[in-house]
Amino acid sequence: MNDFWKSYDITHAELGPNFRCYPLYGKIHLIELALSLVFIVGIALWYRRSSASARRRILVGVTIALLADEAALLLGMALTGQWNWSYLPLHLCSINVFVCLYNTLTDQNWCKEELYALCIPGAALALLCPSWLDVPSWWTLINLHSISIHALLVLYPVLLVVRGYRPSARRAPQVLAFLFGSALPIYFLNKPLNTNFYFLNNPYGNVITSAFTRLLGEKYYILGFLPAIAVALCLMYLPWVVADARHKKRK
């Protein structure tokens, strides 16, 4: 099989479970981050300068790109006989692909809020600390899919804010309800399927959960998500809280 199609399992069998195709913040990783940033900023600027009808077409195009990207991975693994339960789209970022679709179809504020507060930091952190490097090289379906889909997942809610959506810390309980409401069934689903969706089954292969393990131990690493989520929400909402406070002071 060509290296381009190889899954994590085949890579582990051939090169060992500790193999990484490139180092964090090495040349390849920095190029991928730079290209992702240029892509996100470029599309956002184009979107900002576009008419209402053009903005709608761009948002639909990004939604289609997200669905096609997710489908490409699933088809690639299935057609090469490598598909298993771990490729179900049940990680938070994969679920957010369908939240994007639902928002494009229905224009719901709760979707926008969840995508802003959870999807932007989650997808950005995935790009900064990728957990998919245990593949043969950067030129693989898994790596290219992972980079592109996370860049698109940052882009989509950025476009919503550019269009005028104003996030509110008052909606944070809705965001947390979505997060914990989706995490609970997935936690119990991981065990029988031997999967690690939301990184709730084990901390291995992820820089962030590995850090939680060093601090809290393997038994309690999940508790590290709680302060991490709190910090992420504070960072996402702080600019809007400050802006609202300044606006009230001027009045």
Go through the PLM ranges and name each one:
Residues 41-45, 100, 152-171:
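Alpha-helical transmembrane segments in multipass membrane proteins, preferentially the mid-helix core
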Residues 29-35, 81-93, 116:
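Structural signature of hydrophobic alpha-helical transmembrane segments
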Residues 46-59, 105-113, 163-173:
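Membrane-interface helix-boundary motifs at transmembrane edges
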Residues 30-48, 66-71, 183, 226-239:
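Hydrophobic core of alpha-helical transmembrane segments in multi-pass integral membrane proteins
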Residues 65-75, 119-131, 179-189:
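Aromatic-anchored segments of alpha-helical transmembrane domains
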Residues 17-35, 193-233:
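Membrane-interface transmembrane-helix boundary segments in multi-pass integral membrane proteins
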Residues 1-56:
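N-terminal topogenic module of multi-pass integral membrane proteins
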Residues 105-156:
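Membrane-proximal helix-loop-helix units in multi-pass membrane proteins
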